[in-house]
């Protein structure tokens, strides 16, 4: 992208901070795309991904700030709480889909509205980072190195999970033909959850 811009006499990355931001935001988009593509490949488009990410991040920020007041360890606690909250919210979304047997598009729209309503209630419609921002909460993402490490870890985990595990085998079978996969004994419901 920088090369294309340079051919037109423009720069995107003009200093180290610009490079840091480029890698960090590339990591965010890449990881979100990987998460979204998991459902897309199997025919279940999920609109609730953004609301799920926002609600789990706000939950992590609020809890870590309430417990540690933004002090030492707040970023690590926020990360742990955010991951757990994201997993729980994803499980709830999957349970709604499996239990109610509503088409995935309707389920994801409903879950999006519910999660955004909860998010609005928790934050009172205000930007949460003005409340919790301090050096311990934002210092983690200050350099491209952490983003590059996260990209590498996500790629390795994704490759191992989807290419070398029983879950990946079932996922790929369901992705390539749900009816045939189910008829051969692969259980769709645990895979969807």
Predicted regions located by residue number:
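Interfacial loop-to-helix junctions that mark the boundaries of transmembrane helices
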Residues: 12-24, 71-80, 136-148
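Alpha-helical transmembrane segments within multi-pass membrane transporters and channels
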Residues: 69-112
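Small-residue-rich segments of transmembrane alpha-helices in multi-pass membrane proteins
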Residues: 55-61, 110-119, 183
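Residue-level recognition of pore/gate-forming positions within transmembrane alpha-helices
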Residues: 29, 54-58, 86, 112-113, ...
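Single transmembrane alpha-helix segments in multi-pass membrane proteins
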Residues: 2-6, 15-68, 95-101
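Transmembrane helix-bundle core of multi-pass membrane transporters
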Residues: 100, 104-165, 190-193
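Helix-loop-helix "hairpin" substructures at the membrane interface of multi-pass membrane proteins
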Residues: 74-82, 88-93, 143-193
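Structural signal for alpha-helical transmembrane segments and their membrane-water exit/capping regions
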Residues: 1-12, 42, 119-123, 158-166
């Amino acid at each position: 992208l920088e090369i294309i811009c340079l051919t037109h006499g423009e720069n995107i990355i003009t200093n180290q901070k610009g490079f840091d931001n480029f890698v960090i935001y590339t990591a965010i988009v890449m990881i979100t795309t990987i998460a979204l593509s998991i459902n897309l490949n199997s025919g279940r488009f999920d609109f609730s991904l953004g609301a799920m990410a926002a609600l789990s991040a706000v939950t992590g920020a609020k809890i870590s700030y309430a417990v540690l007041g933004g002090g030492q360890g707040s970023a690590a606690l926020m990360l742990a709480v955010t991951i757990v909250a994201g997993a729980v919210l994803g499980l709830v979304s999957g349970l709604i889909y499996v239990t109610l047997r509503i088409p995935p598009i309707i389920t994801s729209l409903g879950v999006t509205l519910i999660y955004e309503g909860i998010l609005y209630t928790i934050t009172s419609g205000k930007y949460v980072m003005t409340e919790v921002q301090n050096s311990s909460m934002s210092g983690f993402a200050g350099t491209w190195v952490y983003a590059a490490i996260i990209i590498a870890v996500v790629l390795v985990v994704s490759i191992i999970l989807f290419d070398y595990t029983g879950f990946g085998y079932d996922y790929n079978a369901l992705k390539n033909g749900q009816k045939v996969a189910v008829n051969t004994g692969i259980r769709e419901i645990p895979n969807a959850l």
